[in-house]
Amino acid sequence: MSLPMDLTVLAAEHGDKAAYVAAESGEALTFRELEARSNQIAHLFRQLGLRRGDHIALLMENRLDLFPVFWAAQRTGLYYTAVNWHLTADEAVYIVDNCQAKVLVSSAPLESIAAQAAAGAARLQHRFVVGGSVDGVPSLDTAMADQPATPVDDQSEGYYMFYSSGTSGRPKGILPEMPDVPFGTGLTLDHQLPNFGFSPAAIYLNTGPLYHAAPIGWSMGTVRNGATAIFMSRFDPELTLKVIEERKVTHAQFVPTMFVRMLKLPQEVRERYDLSSLMLAVHAAAPCPIPVKEAMIDWLGPKVLEYYAGSESNCFFVISAPEWLSHKGSVGKAVIGRAHVLDAEGNELPPGEIGQLWFDGPDFEYHQDPEKTAAAHDERGWSTLGDLGWLDEEGYLYLADRRTDLIISGGVNIYPREVEESLAMHPAVQDIAVIGVPDDEMGQRIHAVVLVAEGVDAGTGLAAELSRDAATRIAAFKLPRTVEFVEDFPRLPSGKVLRRNLIADYDPERAVSMPRLNTQEK
């Protein structure tokens, strides 16, 4: 029996329509080509002995070669993990080994890290290369060339396995339960996308790296719904606008730092492009500062949609632009996983009070890590991602920070996000992170790390200006005492800043004092 989300059915219906398009080059992979290539790779996997529940890993830049491999795994009941190619060799080795991959497919430009990952992965049996030749490593194109372009006999749905943001150590692998359903049934996200307006007429623009949960899930789900997915090799703010205009993009996905970079384009550049085709600008992955989101809604209109979720898939919250305008700062109401706000003793807190967020949604476990799995669950079966937040009287969820990011200065809780939002839209600030650093008197001192905009002169003058500007929005006791101006931030694949790295790299010799303003302190 054929199911509507079976790629064979989609290829018969959409044929030479583009399934995936590389934004920069315009190179495309049609539905028909995707069907044939993914079938050939699927047969290769079966020939190599891979069976339902086995695991493969991929190590590639954003490129068309990824998708036939994704789909081959998806249609043969395999788990597949795309490894962040910006990781160190040690980190890549850990993921390829931890996920127990039997096959690794990598691109030729990443051979150095791929070779080390392969050498350190105990269960790896086969390795293939795309995008060039590597001595001693078989070409995937050559290996699949003689395989049939028709489906294998035992198709079933596979699943992607992600590694959640490693904000406090090694990335945590989230192993989902393999669905025991025929290929073509589709995954949960595939069936949710029509609620966001996805249809065969949709054109989706992915601006993020294809080793992260949302870009993979939405790019796969787009094609499942008969639509076209465009991807960028790396985010560029003006190119994004150009692609939206030229390709008539209907849906695009961002993280807040991308919004900031787009908003800081000159006005004449932003007005140069026709963005009228855009139905939804979806954002997630990190909290969006209120001034940034206000500016995006002013620019695009009520097309900005936010969701909050984790790779653990234990919750999913959504909020539209009209809802957000009357609940500024919220990440929405629950679609999956009701939220509970608990204090340190596990008691449920009333609306308006900040506590740790727990969810009674779908269960999960961290792969081969029972201690982290246990720490993320309580006796009621609820689970947490480690975030702090609160609920209002209407059930809208608001995020504060992660518990590990909280600053306690002079016995007072300081939430970095609030301080960051007070400065995020200053024209001299390209990005900002606020951390707590050791202080003999206060325990922790509030320290801002600022990535300055191009052409800005960083120094004591700018520090004073930022302090004055922030003082118009937040109480004086929340103002940073020192600031460091940097050229780049260490980041996770999602775009989140690695605060632990900033804390570890803190050097008081580089810190610039921010003036103490003559305002009453708490």
Predicted feature residues:
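AMP-dependent adenylate-forming
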Residues: D6-T30, G132
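Structural core segment of the AMP-binding/adenylate-forming
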Residues: L7, Q47-L48, R75-A145, D153, ...
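AMP-binding/adenylate-forming catalytic core of the ANL superfamily
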Residues: L87, L104-S106, K242, A252, ...
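Gly/Ser/Thr-rich phosphate-binding loop
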Residues: Y160-F162, G166, R224-N225, V249-F254, ...
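Conserved AMP-binding/adenylation subdomain of ANL enzymes
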Residues: V181-I203, T207, Y211-H251, L265
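AMP-binding/adenylate-forming catalytic domain of the ANL superfamily
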Residues: T472-K496, R516-E521
